[in-house]
Structure formats: C-alpha cells, structure tokens
Amino acid sequence: MEDKKEEGESEIQEHGPEHWFSKWERQCLAEAEQEDQPEEEAEQSQQKLWHLFQNSATAVAQLYKDRVCQQQGLSLWVPFQNAATAVTNLYKESVDAHQRSFDLGIQIGYQRRNKDVLAWVKKRRRTIRREDLISFLCGKVPPPRNSRAPPRLTVVSPNRATPTETGSSVETDLQPFREAIALHGLSGAMASISVRSSTPGSPTHVSGSSNTGRRRNGLHDVDLNTFISEEMALHLDNGGTRKRTSAQCGDVITDSPTHKRNRMI
C-alpha cells in the first residue's frame, strides 16, 4: 500500500506545472534567468566619455592660458590643434556611445520581455491558446470565450432575388408556425361541425347564437390561416414553394366550415 501511495504521489509531482517542461526547456529557462544585464559595457562607455571630456577641457584651458601668457615668438597653432583634436574625439565617441546605448537598450528590453513571457508561461497550462498569448504580448484583455458559435445571419438586399436555398430554409423555419395555425383553424371548424350535427334534444345542443359564434370563430381561424399562407407565398420567390403553399391553402379551404355549410345548403 505504501509503495502504491508513493507511486501516486510521484505521478502527481511529475504531472505538476513545474514538470511540464522537458530537460532542454528547463535548461533554457535556467540560462535565461541567469543571464546578466550588460551593465559593464555601459559603465565602460561612460568612463571613456568622461576621459575624453577631461582631455578636451584641458586642451581648451591650455589654449586660453597660452593666449594670455603669450611669449615672444611662441605660436598658438599647436595648442589650438590639440584642443581641436580633443573636441573632435569627444564628439565622435559621443556619437558612438549614443548608438551603443541605443542598441544596449533594445537588448535589455528584449531580455526583460523574454523574462516576462517565460514567467507568464510557467504560470499557464500546458497548452496555451493563441489569443491568450497575443493579448499578453499586446497588453490587452483576451476576448470572452463562447462555448457555442453565434448564429450566422444572412442579410439580403431588397433589390436582389432570394436564392432557392434561402427560400426553402425560410419555409422550413416557418413550417411549425403554419402548422400550428392550421391545426387551430381545423379544431375550430371541427367544433362547429360537431355542434351542427348534434340533435336538438341532445345534451350537446346549444342555442343558435352560440352556434353562430362558434361558426364565426372557425371561419376567423381559417381566414387567418389562409391570409398567412397567401402572404408567405407572395414573399417566397421560389416557384415550387408557391405551388406547395397554394396546395396547402387549398387543403385547408376544402375542410373549412364555409365550404361544408354551402354544401349542406
């Protein structure tokens, strides 16, 4: 039992976040963490600039001193040449130091960025989503994850004819709506028919006013179904769809109480 517990604990430790990386990956992470910042190069550049500035200041001061304490027959060309050379060297070294500092700043920025990304990777799961990485690099919040894809809506301009597939899909979507209205109209019609077929002495016999009201309700339901069917047939551009719609309307009108009432009369 103890051996099994130890094996289970070892498996849990092996599958932990710190054991997601391979040996080579851990070695790369260790080298990145131990990489020193290039501060020594920056200090050397500053010391060199300071040394050249001292030489330039000394040469300019010597030039001024020789001009004030000029002796008979002493030329000022040599002190001036020394001062000009020192100032020129200072300018050149300043330009080079500026470029080195710029490159050094980019290098330090990359190192810090790499360390931030590596620290972020250690805290994440074994598999990192692309949007999570992009949002981290861009400094933005990742978009919310939708478990289901949003429905795609097809927008058709009124000037363009609707394709056949679109018409059939619309008819399929509205089919339950049409069936519900048709069943409601048929139930009203059957109720009025059952009332008329009952004998005056039967318990189901009602007065003429209530019978007329039920007839009107049945007629109203059938008329509504007919109206909706005709409107749908007009808005669907598919010829086959119109034929199916008109056929359904004919079936409903055949069973309507109006038709049966005329037949009985």
UniProtKB/Swiss-Prot annotation:
Residues 156-170, 195-212 have a biased composition (Polar residues). One of its GO terms (cellular component) is cytoplasm. Its main location: nucleus. Residues 1-22, 145-170, 195-218, 240-265 are annotated as: Disordered. It is found in: Nucleus; Cytoplasm. Keywords: Cytoplasm, Nucleus, Stress response. GO terms for biological process: negative regulation of signal transduction by p53 class mediator; regulation of cellular response to stress. Signal peptide: none annotated. It holds the Pfam family TAPR1-like. Acts as a central player within a network of stress response pathways promoting cellular adaptability. Functions as a negative regulator of TP53/P53 in the cellular response to telomere erosion and probably also DNA damage. Belongs to the HAPSTR1 family. Oligomer. PANTHER family: CHROMOSOME 16 OPEN READING FRAME 72, UPF0472 PROTEIN C16ORF72. This is HUWE1-associated protein modifying stress responses. It comes from Xenopus tropicalis. The gene is hapstr1.
